[in-house]
Design a protein with these regions (language model features):
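Loop-centered beta-sheet repeat module
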Residues: 3-66
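Surface-exposed loop and turn segments in beta-propeller and other repeat-based domains
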Residues: 14-35, 71-98, 145-160, 202-213
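Structural signature of eukaryotic scaffold interfaces centered on beta-propeller domains
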Residues: 32-47, 95-109, 118, 158, ...
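Short, conserved, GDST-rich strand-edge loop motifs in beta-rich repeat architectures
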Residues: 1-3, 49-64, 114-134
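C-terminal structural cap/anchor segments
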Residues: 92-157
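C-terminal structured domain segments
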Residues: 127-129, 139, 147-198
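Beta-propeller blade signature
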Residues: 2-16, 61-74, 129-145, 186-193
């Protein structure tokens, strides 16, 4: 929850810290809940680190992505992607409206998948007693290298159901959602066809998705 990104580079064989990379362009990086090992995204020879600026609870903190080249010990000074400041998606979110990503999938090339919480654009706030059930999270495809993000053809889900996503062996992406239109369900998105289909309906709100293989 600090104002500075800090990443320790560790020699696991020697059990020693080699260096600590620090950068004040974004706030603390990593996820509070790292049960799916998503604090770091390794893609195209870089380690990408994301800050959600304490979910908006800390005014003045900056959210976004930084990266470290694999094998190096400092953040790449030529790369930053400030999500709130830089990202606009027609019909979804405007630049400078606070927004944050849930933990992403592993990378497929330089692309990852996540849910983008745009509660500010939808005029929802954390102080709403029912905020966890408000449908404010939009499934998105992210290209980390190109710094692009696009909304996918799946409805907004609640923040409770904004963690379950998985890239299958065939390259399609499975999302677990809780939407107003489709209820609690699983969708499969095909990046080649740019289409999504509902593949299952379930009773409880789906959260984590953990592949067993």
């Amino acid at each position: 929850t600090g104002n500075t990104a800090q990443v320790a580079i560790i020699d696991v064989e020697k059990d020693s810290v080699i260096a600590v990379a620090e950068d004040d362009r974004v706030a603390a990086v990593g996820s509070l809940d790292d049960s799916q090992n998503q604090s770091f995204i390794v893609a195209d020879g870089y380690i990408y680190c994301y800050s959600n600026a304490s979910w908006g609870y800390a005014p003045g903190q900056v959210d976004g992505f930084l990266r470290i080249k694999v094998g190096e010990t400092e953040f790449d000074k030529d790369y930053q992607w400030l999500v709130t400041k830089d990202v606009a998606i027609d019909g979804v979110t405007k630049k400078d409206n606070f927004k944050y990503l849930s933990p992403t999938t592993d990378a497929n090339g330089t692309k990852v998948y996540s849910f983008l919480n745009v509660m500010v654009d939808l005029q929802q706030v954390w102080t709403d007693m029912d905020s966890y059930h408000n449908n404010t999270c939009k499934p998105v495809e992210i290209d980390l290298a190109k710094k692009t993000m696009k909304a996918l053809p799946i409805d907004y889900t609640s923040s409770w159901a904004s963690y379950g996503k998985y890239i299958d062996d065939d390259g399609t992406v499975i999302f677990a959602v809780s939407t107003e239109k489709d209820g609690n369900a699983y969708f499969r998105y095909d990046p080649k066809k740019e289409k999504a289909e509902k593949i299952a309906t379930i009773e409880p709100i789906p959260m984590w998705m953990v592949p067993l293989k």
